[in-house]
Amino acid sequence: MWLELCFAIISCIFLLYVPGLIGAASWSSRIDETVAFAPIISVTSYCFAGLVLSLVGVFASAATIIPFALAWCLAVYLVGRLIRRPVSPRDASLVGIVVVYVCIAILVSVFVYILPLDGPGSFVQTYDNVHQYGTARTFLISGDWSPFNSSLYSVPSGEASVLDVVNAFYPSGWHTVVAVLASLTGLSLSLCANAFNFVVLAVIFPIAAASFVACIFNRDREKVLLGAFVTPICAAFPWMLMESWPLFPNALSFSAGLGIVCAFVGMLADSGTAKDRIAYGIMFIIGIVACFFMQPNTVFSLGAMLVPFCIWRAWKLVALSNSCRKHRPLVASLLCGIAIVLIWLFAFNLPFMQPVVQYHWAPITTLPGSIKEVLLVGYPLLPVNIVLAALVFIGFVRSCRNAETVWMAISYLFCALLYIVSASMEPSFIKQLLTGFWYTDAYRVASVLAMAGLPLAVLGACDVRQFIVGLGCARNLDTRTDGITAVVLGRARAGISLLVVVLMCAVSFVPFIVLGDTVLQGPFGFIATSSESHNTMSDSAGYSLSESSFVKKAMAAVPEGETIINMPYDGSMFAYSIDDAPVVFRTMEGYGSKGEDPDSVLIREALCDISWRQDVRDAVESTHAGYVLILERDPDKADAYYTQHHREQWTGITSIADDTPGFEVVLKDGDMRLYRILV
């Protein structure tokens, strides 16, 4: 199984980078930017292919999606060649440093994501994953991969939905890639999801982070190199996103979003030709489309980070004008700021945005607590990271002293405000206005704050390194040496200073520290421990390995075309997405709502009476169900594991016993049963 995971990881890298590299090759002469943008183009091409194939009625699979995506990427490449003729020589100056980024990220990803897995196919059993895995499964079954038709019940005709299904847009970039990978390799869906998540953490994120640091610091090699050790040490991003809820699509879109920043900065850079600006502009537009497919709130995340940059660029562009009057840069900055506010308000009031911006998450901490988390980099609800807090503070002070970097400090302050509001404020118009684009979810906003803090942490690390080098110079160690010795000593100081910074950053990854009788857990130790607990597939899990094994045996006994009535809160809601079982109830919520089908209500509440009630028989017939699956008899376990469970809603199923009229035992193992419906 672990070899299968390795195979899936390698396959995923090919899926994300071969088409994307073809498409991005002609748009930038810098290899690091090309590689950073490759997965953005690939994800866009797969989603676009799924949409087109859905419109023309072609069954989507790896065999039909991949050729279409390759053709689309080739078209993108040819357009880039036409725009950027003649092609500039390739700039590979940062490739070696990018490799360092990836190597470090691989080590961290293995520790934080792979080792906590309870087997390569284990998964976190939460609400988000019911939908995420279920949507990918529906793609594979239905062959309809359109993001406008995503649903747990959007399947071939003949299978009824127990809930009113309204085909609407849902960002399904993550689901599409998982479906492509599963279709290509034939491996389990959960294993393919783990492979893709690992690639996001270990490949997409570090490459995009390297390109991000390079573009905002004008490709300063010292800062880019230090970024390799600084960018992975903030636990809130991307690592926490893989553990909380978990937010796989946001982890993908935020990680790739760092590459989109490069296109935006390149479009507004002082240097570069008109063709370069056009190329970066088109890449930026493709990136925004990719965000639309992956997770649209990434657009607002990047916007929150780059608002100060835009205002600063407006000032600088006008100030550099030869005919500029003294007040015009200020006017330009004000107009830019007003335009951004108006765009924010316009988006906030769009009708289709209301379900998002009006959604509310309860506060996770107090106002003083959220401020403390920001100052000590312990957000969201993580153990503090003193090293990173010190680097961010030093970088913040330095950025405020330089007109070229002051926007970074302002960006961090704004994102810190967003986090404090989302984490501590009760429902209010201000909270919805400022953080509604992220569902007012403090975990998502914490990732935005972490991204805004990356440049400051790099500046802080640079200052620390220069301070250490300066200590050596101040001691005049080489005043009486020849030239060669001076060079050796200089390089030694540079190496020692870099080593000190590396060791400082490495402290962030220490799982725990023992101080006498006190054990202090580090942020990454906390994530690894929590992830290990959430990934368990033991009998204490909602859907355990033994239950999954029973479901597979049950599927062998159920004729093709028949569905299985289940009680989802015994863990069987995951039987559909993980094991491809045709269960009727496959969502975590919606039962008892206005959107539930009356037949569904009747089945939930009165299935045990099927032997004498014709209305129950008719309801069962409407779902094409011939069997009943029960995995757990103890309602207390369902209460403890799923807060949405209300035992009184499921008495029609949970009351069925081996001697209930109208049912026949087909399989049994402990409390687990598969019944055949006899009437």
Predicted regions and their residues:
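Membrane-embedded, hydrophobic transmembrane alpha-helices
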Residues: 1-95
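Signature aromatic-anchored transmembrane alpha helix within multi-pass, membrane-resident enzymes
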Residues: 333-341, 464-521
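Extracytoplasmic
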Residues: 11, 17, 24, 476, ...
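Perimembrane helix-loop-helix junctions
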Residues: 302-335
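Membrane-helix boundary/interfacial segments in multi-pass membrane proteins
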Residues: 56-63, 119-127, 186, 239-252, ...
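Membrane-embedded helix bundles of polyisoprenyl
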Residues: 38-51, 101-111, 167, 183, ...
